[in-house]
């Protein structure tokens, strides 16, 4: 009788399990203090599998950041493209960010607190391209609203800080335990402020 093949995690599933374990370790003890062995134990993977997917701990940290920011951007664009007006679009940028952070606290905390991680040059280049591509998509969406006067014509680099900056700051304070009210309770305040700042 032929032996049944052993069920093993597929490559995407293994990669995902390593990233999830790494996130737990990074949040629990910090990126610097986390070792490769910590991630291997937490994920149940082999060290060979980790090196195959990511190369080293810095590669895991970079992969986790890229994965998180890509999901955040994709979720925003998906919601944004359901909007019918300038007002609903601006408000969605704010409320979707708030909702995403609330639903994905650990990865949001990692994204917001990863500024000091020494990503390799190729990761920095990839992140710049991800950011550029995302901003192009967002501005392509809002461009017609600016042209038809529904939104103010402002210097292009000011829209993101005006619309997204305040809610990003608030969620950072909330994740750090510096403010009490959850973003869900105050997102409407920030959405109103963003719309009032850019409405035509």
Q: Which sequence ranges carry the predicted segments?
A:
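N-terminal intrinsically disordered/low-complexity leader segments
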Residues: 1-13
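Helix-turn-helix
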Residues: 13-17, 25-59, 63
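Generic hydrophobic, amphipathic alpha-helix propensity
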Residues: 14-22, 39, 64-68, 72, ...
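Short helix-capping/turn signature of helix-turn-helix
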Residues: 54, 113-119
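Hydrophobic alpha-helical connector segments
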Residues: 63, 77-103, 159-163, 187
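Amphipathic alpha-helical packing segments from all-alpha helical-bundle domains
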Residues: 70-73, 77, 121-148, 157-161, ...
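Hydrophobic/aromatic-rich alpha-helical bundle segments in the mid-to-C-terminal region
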Residues: 106-113, 124, 146-193
């Amino acid at each position: 009788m032929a032996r049944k093949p052993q069920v093993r995690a597929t490559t995407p599933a293994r990669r995902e399990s390593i990233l999830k374990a790494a996130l737990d370790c990074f949040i629990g003890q910090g990126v610097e203090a986390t070792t490769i062995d910590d991630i291997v134990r937490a994920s149940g993977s082999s060290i060979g599998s980790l090196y195959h997917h990511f190369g080293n701990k810095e590669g895991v940290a970079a992969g986790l950041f890229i994965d998180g920011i890509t999901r955040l951007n994709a979720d925003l664009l998906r919601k944004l493209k359901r909007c019918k007006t300038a007002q609903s679009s601006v408000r969605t940028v704010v409320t979707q960010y708030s909702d995403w952070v609330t639903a994905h606290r650990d990865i949001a905390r990692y994204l917001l607190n990863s500024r000091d991680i020494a990503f390799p040059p190729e990761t920095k280049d990839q992140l710049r391209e991800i950011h550029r591509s995302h901003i192009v998509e967002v501005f392509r969406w809002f461009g017609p609203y600016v042209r038809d006067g529904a939104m103010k014509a402002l210097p292009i680099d000011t829209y993101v800080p005006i619309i997204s900056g305040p809610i990003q700051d608030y969620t950072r304070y909330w994740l750090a335990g510096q403010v009490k009210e959850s973003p869900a309770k105050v997102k409407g305040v920030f959405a109103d402020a963003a719309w009032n700042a850019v409405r035509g």
